Amino acid sequence: NSAHPCCDPVKCEPREGEHCISGPCCRNCKFLNAGTICKKAMLDGLNDYCTGISSDCPRNRYKGKEDD
């Protein structure tokens, strides 16, 4: 049972100096750069992009409500 390299095993949060543990916009314990595609476009033709400040992949703000 090996500990996750990004995770402080005592506090269960990113180690000091690291940004994140996992997520579509997290790689090697760091947030991916803003503008990195985290979800490729489907029928709507709009990709979703990382923000550079979160490990989540936010929905493209230009997608309409019907694109859910």
From Swiss-Prot:
* Disulphide bridges: C6-C29, C20-C26, C25-C50, C38-C57
Q: Name one GO molecular function term.
A: toxin activity
The record places the motif (Cell attachment site) at 42-44
Instruction: State a GO cellular component annotated for this protein.
Output: extracellular region
* UniProt cross-references to InterPro entries, sorted A to Z: Disintegrin_CS, Disintegrin_dom, Disintegrin_dom_sf
The superkingdom of the source organism is Eukaryota
Quote the subcellular location field of this record: Secreted
| Tissues in which the protein is found | Expressed by the venom gland.
Its main subcellular localisation, reduced to a broad class, is: secreted
Q: Which UniProt keywords apply?
A: Cell adhesion impairing toxin, Disulfide bond, Hemostasis impairing toxin, Platelet aggregation inhibiting toxin, Secreted, Toxin
Q: Which residues form the Disintegrin domain?
A: 1-65
Matching Gene3D superfamilies:
Disintegrin domain
**Extra info from the record?**
Negative results: does not inhibit alpha-1/beta-1 (ITGA1/ITGB1), alpha-2/beta-1 (ITGA2/ITGB1) and alpha-6/beta-1 (ITGA6/ITGB1).
Q: Which family does it belong to?
A: Belongs to the disintegrin family. Dimeric disintegrin subfamily.
Q: What does the function comment of this entry state?
A: Poor inhibitor of platelet aggregation. The disintegrin inhibits the adhesion of both the alpha-4/beta-1 (ITGA4/ITGB1) and the alpha-5/beta-1 (ITGA5/ITGB1) integrins to VCAM-1 and fibronectin respectively with almost the same degree of specificity. Inhibition on alpha-IIb/beta-3 (ITGA2B/ITGB3) is low.
Assembly and interaction partners: Heterodimer; disulfide-linked.
Question: By what name is this protein known?
Answer: Disintegrin EMS11A
What organism is recorded for this protein?
Echis multisquamatus (Central Asian sand viper)
